Amino acid sequence: MTITPPSADALEYLESLMRAGRDAMKQFDDALASVAGVRDKEANSLGPLSPIGLVADLQRDVFKHLWQFWNAAFLQAFAGGAHSNAVLARGDKRFKDEAWHEMPYYDLIKQSYLLGSRQLHDFVDRAQVDDKTKLQLRFYVRQYIDAMSPSNFPATNPEVIRKAIETRSASLTDGIRNLIDDLQKGRITRVDESAFEVGRNLAITPGTVVFENELIQLIQYTPQTSEVEKTPLLIVPPCINKYYLLDLGAGNSLVEYAVAQGQQVFLISWRSAVPEIGHLTWDNYLEMGPLRAVDVVREITGAERVHALGFCVGGTILSCAAAVLAAKQEDKLSTMTLLTTMLDFSDTGEIGLLIDAASVALREATIGKSGILPGKELAFTFGTLRANDLIWRYVVDNYLKGATPDAFDLLFWDSDCVSLPGPMYCWYTRNTYLENNIKDPGKTTQCGVPVDLSKINVPVYLLASREDHIVPWKSAFRSKDLIGGEARFVLAASGHVAGVINPPARNKRSHWLNDDLEPDPQGWFEAAQEKPGSWWPDWDAWMKRHSTGTIPAPTQSGSPQYPPIEPAPGRYVKQKSN
């Protein structure tokens, strides 16, 4: 069927209707402002804190956007006008299908949803509440908005309907099967789990487990160079994830890179908590983790000191352990590297919104003495921070379209969650996110001594990621003022994981350098120089500047006191969280 374009007279008549509508809207706006006492917005006698003034402003904006929306929709449907222009967030792929733009029905649904979303966000932004409450409101409103997206429902998603027609409903049958499987697992499947196996194509850098206790295994990696650094490197990964994020595979491994640069690399593999260790505390994690590992590494290598690297929560644990050593006047560290680590929890980003006094008190009452925080709960919490990408995307693809997830190593790692002992978790959340005690000298007692981070007098390399939603980079920047040693701060592009795992050979992303750490974070960034590619070579050069010389590479792993136990990656990393 051919649609005849409207005549010039019809378009002129349509325009007159539009003008009349705008005039009517203006009259309504004036009447509303008169009732609210805010006719002159510049001379608003009620002030910005007035609920009436707030409602009046919101009503004006609602009707303004409604008019623009229906104007564009009418022109598109009946007058051959241009498509309405909705502003999508960067990276929003929910409405990428052409039907959302080309078909008036779906465009109308999409535009209505986006308009309603914007109004909800505006309402929160204008709410007269304290900053913490506003951030919480913004977070929970976003959860609601994300959940109610028309792309999440089969009747309003053109891709789902098209797929069902093309497959004669087989996609819906497959989706139901996927849903049942995930209900049995207790989590959403986001990756083809059959494509990966720890020890086969993940965590494959050659090495040997040379020590273990009920909490950790310690891996010594096989040297790949004839000479190695005299001072060994101990890596402390986060205890809330499996360590192999740092050893994803050949060419995509920070561990492999460090070994190739001649470092003597040791790494802690944390055990996922089981009932037998559900009583372990924060102090146990320090004593049985990095403090014990440092002594084992020193005995095996004969070195007086070790370089230490901590990632995320592993960096927080390492820093506290270093402060314990400083308090006991035990000079066992040569340098520290902290990757996306928070020590000052003044600004914790969105994850801090999920940890309040009530939630911590509840955990303390239930698992504070003994018990387990399941890894699935931690994984779901982190997933809500990016619900569209980590939850709803897979609800649509797996359950509505019946698709099988792709093979992606990072998502496999992200799904391989770790459980924590209740006492350790409760101490950590109360003294970091809730009360921010660690940064204050002497405010916490750990391993029997008062902890003062400023007593850590070793050079420290600080890395943050510019788009990190878990450790805001400006929070990581403040660590330079807490640790007593000379600091170097580097800012990587991208987020919490991709900013860290960026092998030089891929020549991707960038990082920022500025030796002047005196300004505030924003001042530092504005004066920083952007460098293309990975930050890894900069870290390697920094490590070389703090080298104590090289020695012939050892030909055997372990020592008579700590003989080899089993090949890397060991048993602990393969254990699944219940």
What are these regions (language model features)?
Residues V228-C239:
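Short beta-strand element of the alpha/beta-hydrolase
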Residues I456, L462-A464, D468:
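Short beta-strand/loop motif that positions the catalytic acidic residue
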Residues M1-I216, V228-E229, F266, S479, ...:
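Amphipathic, low-complexity, repeat-rich surface-exposed segments
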Residues V129-R162, E299, A303, I317, ...:
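Alpha/beta-hydrolase-fold enzymes
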Residues I277-T301:
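Alpha/beta-hydrolase active-site loop
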